[in-house]
Amino acid sequence: MIKLEQVVEILKKDNNFREISSAGEYYFNWPKEVNFDQLSYDSRKSTKDTLFFAKGLNFKKEYLTDLEAAFYVSEFDYEVALPAIIVTDVKRAMALIAANFYKFPQNKLKTLALTGTKGKTTSAYFAKSILDKMNGGKTALLSTAQTTLDGQNYFKSELTTPESLDLLEMMAKALENGMTHLVMEVSSQAYKTERVYGLTFDVGVFLNISPDHIGPVEHPTLEDYFYCKRQLLKNSRYFVANAEMNHFAIIKEELNERKIPHAFYGADSENKIIESKGLHFVTDGSVSGEFDIRLLGRFNQENALATALATKALGASFENIRQGLASAIVPGRMELLTAKNGAHIYIDYAHNGLSLENLVEVVEDHHAGQLFLVLGSTGNKGESRRKDFGQVIENHPRLNVILTTDDSNRENPKTIADEIASFVSRELDFELDREFAIKKAISKTQNSDDAVIIAGKGADMFQLKDGKREPYIGDSPAAQKYL
């Protein structure tokens, strides 16, 4: 429960309160006592004791006409019968009010937040596995792929970083379930849309940056994308950053100026990988020793080093780190299947140019035969990825490519595929039925020298079409049918 008086006080302290509007009158303080038993931004879940948040570009006045709620919070006075708390920024208001409503669960959990263009989910699972070794399995996880609030039962995530109201509720539930630590991915959109406003993380990690999510729906420019991601820096008590990432200089400069304790990793830093072979690697620095992970590729080893440094800052021992990394399983990340003829099938969530480039390089290094790539791209978001995908394909002439459907949403998947193909000088194959595209690629393999890469969906069991998630067999189950 939270009182209206408390809500107004929170907003005033944040310089985010304009007035209360009711029946044509305006109030700086409401004359009566009002208690809210629930917070919601979903009209279907609102009750007479709900404080409702009217947010979103597509919000309409009619949504409030028959709404059952006590008050609504908005940047705009819709002049309906329901009393309104008018604010400057409804998203910031929701974040701070939710934190108070759920009794500040973020202060009772040890939190580790990860950002970067690629590798967030893999690193999140690495970190959870390490912390579980330290705390006996009391680590909650919020990732792009899955969410667990009790450390054991997982459900599909809706967003990389949930809306602030949902996020604070999840944190509170994690505490109720006896969790002591939380690992979460923080997207650039989370900062752009104030989903993590008011939160300070115990440890923040910045893995890398490359052009992605650039488009009219997400970030207009790379600068905006990078700036939003950098907000994690000043909202972390300790910070881990990749010294080899693009534009590292400004990160180093800002960390030093803000006097935030930190650790860097990479070839030219104190913490580095000095030996790498297959699934085994050796590190030097503050976490020095030999490690094994279940994923191929140096970039995965670099992510492992980043999480080793981050979890060490939370108290993990060398053995916690070594055992945690060795046992970590990441769904939809370089999942490996073997066909009857010995060919390897790699299923990976790689959904931007940088992650696809790294994935292709690893597979090329391990397979001398034919290489097949099954790939699509999302519709109505991340439009810049299509050019990036085309350039990766162009730069790797060994790839036999079958362009297919990803989460096409409200765009024509053939139009998306054609755009990818426009950046490639050689002929590509098209099969818009994703399962048949997978079948076709596997059927073309001959022996253990060959490999198929199925990229973009990972462990997703749906395809986004016309704004709705439609059931999809999943890349792994589809591939298993045709091995």
UniProtKB/Swiss-Prot annotation:
Residues modified as N6-carboxylysine are 229
One cellular component term from this protein's GO annotations in UniProt: cytoplasm
Q: Keywords, A to Z?
A: ATP-binding, Cell cycle, Cell division, Cell shape, Cell wall biogenesis/degradation, Cytoplasm, Ligase, Nucleotide-binding, Peptidoglycan synthesis
Q: InterPro entries, from UniProt? A: Mur-like_cat_sf, Mur_ligase_C, Mur_ligase_C_dom_sf, Mur_ligase_cen, MurE/MurF_N, UDP-N-AcMur-Glu-dNH2Pim_ligase
The residues that the entry says bind UDP-N-acetyl-alpha-D-muramoyl-L-alanyl-D-glutamate are: 43, 160-161, 187, 195
Q: Where does ATP bind?
A: 116-122
Query: Could you list the residue ranges that cross the membrane?
Result: none
Q: Which family does it belong to?
A: Belongs to the MurCDEF family. MurE subfamily.
Per its database record, what is this protein's job?
Answer: Catalyzes the addition of an amino acid to the nucleotide precursor UDP-N-acetylmuramoyl-L-alanyl-D-glutamate (UMAG) in the biosynthesis of bacterial cell-wall peptidoglycan.
NCBIfam families named among the record's database cross-references: murE, PRK00139.2-5, PRK14022.1
- Protein name per the record: UDP-N-acetylmuramyl-tripeptide synthetase
Source organism per UniProt:
Lactococcus lactis subsp. cremoris (strain SK11)
What's the source species' lineage?
Answer: Bacteria, Bacillati, Bacillota, Bacilli, Lactobacillales
